[in-house]
Amino acid sequence: MKARVLIVDDSALARRNLRQILESANCEVDEAEDGLAALERYFLERPDVVLLDLVMRGMYGLDVLEKLRQLDPLAKVVVVSADVQTSSQQLVDQAGAKAFITKPFDREEIIGTLKAVLGGTS
C-alpha cells in the first residue's frame, strides 16, 4: 500500500508504533504531536489520510477533526483512540471521520482500515 499518512498523537510511543506499522506497509509517514502542528503539517504535506488521536494536550482531537473538515471537506481522517465511549465515537462519526480504531490496535487493523478508507489503494 503506497499512501502518505500523517500521524497526530501527543504520545511519542504511539507515533513510533504507528510509524513502524505504516512504514512496513510502504507508506510515507509524517508526524505531529499536537493539533496545531497537525493542521500546519496537513496543509504543507497534503497526506492521503490522517491518523488522529482524540485526547491530546492543547487542542482536542475532535476540534482538529472539525477544523480539518471545515478547511478541506475531502480530508480523510481515521481516529485512533483509547476513548471507547459510544458518545465519543458518535461525535467523531458526526464530525466526518472515516473510521474509528480503538487503542490498543494491531497491524492488521491499521492496514485494513487504511485500505478501506483509501479505496483499496495499493
Pin down the residues of each PLM region:
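Residue-level signal for the "D+5" position in two-component response regulator receiver
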Residues: 31, 58-59, 94
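Charged docking surfaces used in two-component/phosphorelay signaling
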Residues: 16-24
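Acidic catalytic/metal-coordinating carboxylates
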Residues: 34-37, 60-63
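The feature encodes the CheY-like receiver
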Residues: 57-58, 85
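Short hydrophobic/Thr-rich beta-strand motif most characteristic of the beta2 strand and flanking loop
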Residues: 26-33, 41
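Active-site beta3 strand of CheY-like receiver
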Residues: 45-51
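Alpha4 helix (beta4-alpha4-beta5 surface) of REC/receiver domains from two-component response regulators
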Residues: 63, 84-101, 108, 112
